[in-house]
Structure formats: C-alpha cells, structure tokens
UniProtKB/Swiss-Prot annotation:
GO biological process: gluconeogenesis
Cofactor binding, note field: Binds 1 Mn(2+) ion per subunit.
Catalytic activity: oxaloacetate + ATP = phosphoenolpyruvate + ADP + CO2
Record key words, sorted: ATP-binding, Cytoplasm, Decarboxylase, Gluconeogenesis, Lyase, Manganese, Metal-binding, Nucleotide-binding
Upper lineage: Bacteria, Bacillati, Bacillota, Bacilli, Bacillales
Chain residues that bind substrate: 58, 195, 201, 321
Biological role stated in the UniProt entry: Involved in the gluconeogenesis. Catalyzes the conversion of oxaloacetate (OAA) to phosphoenolpyruvate (PEP) through direct phosphoryl transfer between the nucleoside triphosphate and OAA.
GO cellular component, one term: cytosol
Protein name per Swiss-Prot or TrEMBL: Phosphoenolpyruvate carboxykinase (ATP)
Pathway: Carbohydrate biosynthesis; gluconeogenesis
Entry similarity comment: Belongs to the phosphoenolpyruvate carboxykinase (ATP) family.
C-alpha cells in the first residue's frame, strides 16, 4: 500500500509536538534522563560513558540516498551513494514514526548546522534515546535560548530510532540498520544503530550536497587560526590527526571536522567536537583531555567499577570517542569562523611507511592528492577494520560526498589560485618500514613540521625531490631529525623501500584511472608516475 508523504509529515509534526516529546532539555535534565533510563554510566571525570553495542562505528553499506527526480541527476550514484526508491523510504519512515509514537518519551532538539548565517541549516533532531539528544546538543550549533529554539522552523530533520530494526526484504535496506537521506522530504532517517556519529555525518553529507550548489566549498577538515589571523586547514580521514593537530595551544580552534569556505572565508559546520579517545592522555593532548568533563559524552570507553576511565583499553573498539561542545576547548575562535586560509595540510596515515613526513605540493599535485585521498583505514572507524588497510577516499571524505568529486576539486583549485594558498602533504603514519615493521611517526615531530609549515618557516626553505615520488621535501626543519625527512633514509633496507614505494605508486595510478579523461591533466601535471 502506497504511503502518502503528507501523512508522514503530519505524523512527524505530531511526534514533535506531543507532550511526551521533551523539547530542548538542558544538559542537566538530559543527564538525569540518561541515568534514570540506565542508558549510560557516570565517570569520575563527570562525563557520561555510553556503550553503543554491536555498532561502534559508521555503517557505510547501510547508507542510502532517496532516488528522487529533482535530485537524481546531481548525485554521484555508486557504492557510497546507494539509491533507495522514494516509495520504500516513505513506507519505512511511516513504520519508524509509528514505532516512535508508542514510546513513553522522546527527546527533541532544535539547532543549526553552519556558523555562516547565510547558508545555515535549521535543524530538528528527534531521538528515541536521551543520550543521542545530548549528543545532538553537543555536536550541532546550539540556539542561545529556549525561546530562540522554539522559533526555529527546520529545513532538515533527523529522526533517530536506534532500537527499530528494518526488514531488508520488505524495506529495501541492506540489513536491519539504515541511514537514509531524502533531499526532497528533507529528512535523515536512522535506525538499527546506536552509533551517534551517524547523525553528525548525515548532516555533513547534506551540507556536502547543498553548499557546492551555491559555489561554496564544503570540506572534511579541521581548521585553526593564529594570533595574526593566519588560517590553516587540516584535511584527513578519521584517525589521521585532524582533531589532535588542530588543537594547538598557540592557535584558536575554528572546528575539528567539518567546514565550509565561502567568499568571506572559513566557517565551521558544527558546534562541537567528536574526538578519538583511544590512548588519550593529559600529557599528549591536554586540550582534548580537559574537555572531558560534565556534559561530555564518551562512547565505548572502558570504565572501572569506581568510575575511573581507562582510555588505553580497547575492549569494545579502537574507535572510542568523546563528544563535547566546542566551547569546552579554552582556545577557540568566537564565532567559529575566520578569513581565507594561508595553509592547507593533507594528512595521510601511510601504512606502507614510504611517503615523506612532509612535502610541499604544487596546485596540480594538490588536486591530484585531494582527488586521490590516500590514507589507511584505521582500526575501529568502520565495522570490520581491525588493522590499517591502505585505501583511497576521494577528497579525504568519500563516504560523505553526494556530488561528483570533480566538483569539489574544481572549487578547491579555484580557491587555491585566488587566495595563493600553500599546500602540504603530511604523513602521520609509519616510517622505517610498513605497519607491523616500522614505527608510527612521533606526534612531537609531526607537530613541529606542521608548525613550521603554518608559521611560514618553509616558505624560503631549501627543498629537494625525493627519488621515488618526485615530491618536494624540506632539507631541514628545526627540531626534526634529518633522518626521517627523506623516508628512504629511515629504512634499513633501501631496496625494500623502493620496492614498497613503487607498489604504492602503482596503487595511486590504478586508483586515479576511475576519474577518466576529464582529470588527465591533473594526473599528468601533478600525479605519481609508475
């Protein structure tokens, strides 16, 4: 039986407005609900820890975009953007709304995505679980008052029902879990997973569709700004160091994961941070550690009986997380925007151990590496990943890009030219051998190299080409051992290094074929040669 979209909308409005849907609860009220409902446990740091059960990371194979005529031609359909028919979406959302209508209480948050008011999304988030609502409160941009929240007329709504399981045969999903985006109905429908990151990444996917349509670049990156107004962007996939490297004591954080770049400069899409918490220590990452307090949500961290948190224990997953409002970081830009960037850093965790720890890129090389998006998938950020796997994620964010990647590359190229931005490739992965043989590049050295790039120390530095990749590598950086700058020198067997490097080059070349003749110039002018 066909489901009418208007009926769905009425059901959704009914859910939001019914007295048992608790609207815009404070942090304290949500804490009380979380503890009363036995959803989470209080830690000695004051943060609440949540165990998300079966799903401790995103489920990319369970993500769909509704195949709607007005949007069909713009979407880059494939394994990332899987289509689902509108009728199936409406039927499933009808079931989810009926399911939520049976609940004693629901939790509703109104807020925003995007700190630039001209392009801001107005959001309503409807949650089955109180802790998911606190997550939304922490991660999206919060209105200044309940009065302001009540006046928000949403142009996108998240409906999250983690305990609702889909029937794949009937509902057209890949499993009992689903994350479905409808641009026509302006809804993100989530079910079958308690992993809260699906909400934030769902909205990021939406912004990655909407912003480029207005000639605004959307980016999977962190950003910070120095005392003189100099802005740096850090691109990279989960676990490559975006959050860690952008949290610098002498620079103000703009945001740790999602940004837009328009005619005025950079703006944060979010109102919070979602930091990896595995092996977190006050010594290594003081800003993040100090943000873990009352109001913060920890995901899948091990908590001892006395409430003490063991950040080193990966019993549940490597992908432990901390979600906190951005103002829990002392050193932030207010509001979360800044001028045009001076420096862009592409972060990659190279599990082969062959890329230089830092190299300077031409614009053509920058576009090649942006489209390639090479990194290694790190343990726990997706289901089934237990050790690093070399992978290519277009634009350092393929799972979240609804449009053809060339659109994002085109925008980036124009902006690099217009604002004369310096671009660097930074390997935060391995040196002296591949994963299992070599060692992870020291965070202390990576911080120093990044600092040198951002502060302009490398502008007049001497560079030399590395013999295999042809990348421009600085000959010397203060307080960084010369032995690691040229990666071949860090390997005990240089022939083994060359063989491993050629293996990686062949993977780059093979991967880039998917972009076809349209990107041939980028490959010829900026690409690796087999």
């Amino acid at each position: 039986m066909a489901v009418d979209a208007q009926t769905n909308l009425q059901k959704l409005n009914h859910l939001i407005e019914k007295p048992s849907s608790l609207f815009q609860l404070t942090k304290t009220q949500l804490y009380n609900k979380i503890l009363d409902n036995n959803e989470g446990e209080l830690t000695e740091l004051g943060a609440i820890n949540q165990l998300t059960g079966q799903y401790t990371g995103r489920s990319p194979k369970d993500k769909f975009i509704v195949n709607e005529p007005s949007y069909r031609d713009a979407i880059d359909w494939g394994s990332v953007n899987q289509p689902i028919e509108e009728e199936k979406f409406l039927r499933l959302s009808d079931k989810v709304l009926d399911y939520l209508d049976q609940k004693d209480e629901l939790y509703v948050f109104n807020g925003y995505a995007g700190s630039d008011q001209d392009t801001q999304l107005r959001l309503t988030v409807v949650n089955e679980m109180a802790w998911h609502n606190l997550f939304a409160h922490n991660m999206f941009i919060r209105p200044s008052s309940k009065d302001e929240a009540e006046k928000i007329k949403p142009n996108f709504t998240i409906v999250s029902a983690p305990h609702f399981k889909a029937n794949p045969e009937e509902d057209g999903t890949a499993s009992e879990t689903f994350v479905i985006i409808s641009f026509k109905h302006r809804i993100i429908l989530i079910g079958g997973t308690e992993y809260a990151g699906e909400m934030k990444k769902g909205i990021f996917s939406v912004m990655n569709y909407l912003l480029p349509q207005q000639d605004i670049m959307s980016m999977h990156c962190s950003a910070n700004v120095g005392e003189k107004g100099d802005v740096a962007l850090f691109f990279g996939l989960s676990g490559t160091g975006k959050t860690t490297l952008s949290a610098a004591p002498d620079r103000k954080l703009i945001g740790d994961d999602e940004h837009g770049w328009n005619k005025n400069g950079i703006f944060n899409i979010e109102g919070g941070c979602y930091a990896k918490a595995i092996n977190l220590s006050k010594e290594k990452e003081p800003q993040i550690y100090d943000a873990i307090r009352y109001g913060t949500i920890l995901e899948n961290v091990v908590v001892e009986e006395d409430g003490n948190v063991d950040f080193d224990d990966n019993k549940y997953t490597e992908n432990t997380r901390a979600a906190y409002p951005i103002d829990y970081i002392d050193n932030i830009a207010k509001p979360s925007k800044a001028a045009h960037p001076n420096t862009i850093l592409f972060l990659t965790a190279d599990a082969f151990g062959v890329l230089p720890p830092i190299s300077k890129l031409t614009k053509e090389q920058a576009l090649y590496h942006f489209l390639s998006g090479f990194t290694s998938k790190l343990a726990g950020t997706e289901r089934g990943i237990t050790e690093p796997v070399p992978s290519f994620s277009t634009c350092f964010g393929a799972p979240f890009l609804p449009l053809n990647p060339k659109r994002y590359a085109e925008l980036l190229g124009q902006l690099i030219d217009k604002h004369e931005v310096e671009v660097y490739l930074v390997n935060t992965g391995w040196t002296g051998g591949k994963y299992g043989v070599g060692r992870r590049i020291s965070l202390k050295y990576t911080r120093r190299m990044v600092d040198a790039a951002i502060k302009g120390e490398l502008k007049n530095a001497e560079f030399e080409k590395d013999e295999v990749f042809g990348l421009s590598v600085p000959k010397d950086i203060k307080d960084v051992p010369k032995s690691i700058l040229q990666p071949i020198n860090a390997w005990s067997n240089q022939d083994a290094y060359r063989e491993q490097a050629q293996d990686l080059i062949s993977r780059f070349v093979e991967n880039f074929k998917k972009f076809g003749d349209d990107s041939k110039d980028i490959a010829e002018q900026g690409g690796f040669k087999a």
